[in-house]
């Protein structure tokens, strides 16, 4: 019998005004208290997380629904947004972040991205009306979004876009079964160069997501597979094809680099980090088969780990493509069954390690991983110890449990997307690093939720 939820989801606010048409996805800015929402009305709506009001409407760049968007990381002085549309194009938008000072501020907003992120957040909160009524300035705000460049290459609807950790590479995927990787030349002229086109998927590619610390890309597809891609000697190629889902894989997301399960004592947390250092961050996926699954990379042999140079041990360049680039990924666990219909999005919090999933049943589900003892009652959902655990110590056992659910979160409508964001409104507890959940649905609405544990 499933355990009773131990946390509570509560509606904090709707983002207003909502779109009058279906909304697909909401992307929180990496350093500022704003989000961008993609809509079927061909626009992207930018909302404040300080007062939950519409700040800008980005329009004019696409001829059909805007399906996806992503903020470029590590940009100083401006915000850069990539948008993907059903018109088969990708747009790049820019806007200067010069908004003056604020009384309240959000100096702690940044998540270790840049030294100036706190000042940037404070200026934005003020200029975007943190606690004030600035709606009459919306028209001026709109004009400040500059449509920088249109990336044309896909033959069909663009389903997902994702920036690499450095912000230099942009991955896009499409119904045309291809994945494109573009390099931002950062030359001041908004020039992008096509780095790779990968066509190994045998169906519509639904999602692309970059590893949080490496230039490794994960993709999810209508062909029921997840694939991993890396660059080797200037040539991008597939290094793993993960099979396990019995239906379309809608979404993949990565674990945070320093994520540790809930309730960890210092020594246990250190043991966890040591035993997971070789395999790196895990991957989570969700599917038409109604499951949410976690995958872990098998560590390579120590010699392969040490000799990663394309020049080999001699230091002399080799004209032969090195072997051993393939990776082995295994299913670590399937999370407790909590959805009745297709699961469209799963999001892994980089701050808390919590997982959230949403889908066609209109339900929000939040999961937590915790350390457990070795008794047989907890073995069903436990992760397997790593055979290559550091210093021979076994990996601590964990299990995933559902800690909160919300049925009918958007009334009768399907929920298309969920994301974690840092809380920025006045109700935030002083000194607390709180997170909120942001859900995006077919009703055109975007809702912000708190989770009390």
Curated annotation (Swiss-Prot):
Keywords: Repeat, WD repeat. Residues 132-142 have a biased composition (Acidic residues). The keyword Metal-binding does not apply. GO terms for biological process: iron-sulfur cluster assembly. PROSITE patterns: WD_REPEATS_2, WD_REPEATS_REGION. InterPro entries: CIAO1/Cia1, G-protein_beta_WD-40_rep, WD40/YVTN_repeat-like_dom_sf, WD40_repeat_dom_sf, WD40_rpt. It comes from the Eukaryota. Belongs to the WD repeat CIA1 family. This is Probable cytosolic iron-sulfur protein assembly protein 1. It comes from Aspergillus clavatus (strain ATCC 1007 / CBS 513.65 / DSM 816 / NCTC 3887 / NRRL 1 / QM 1276 / 107). The gene is cia1.
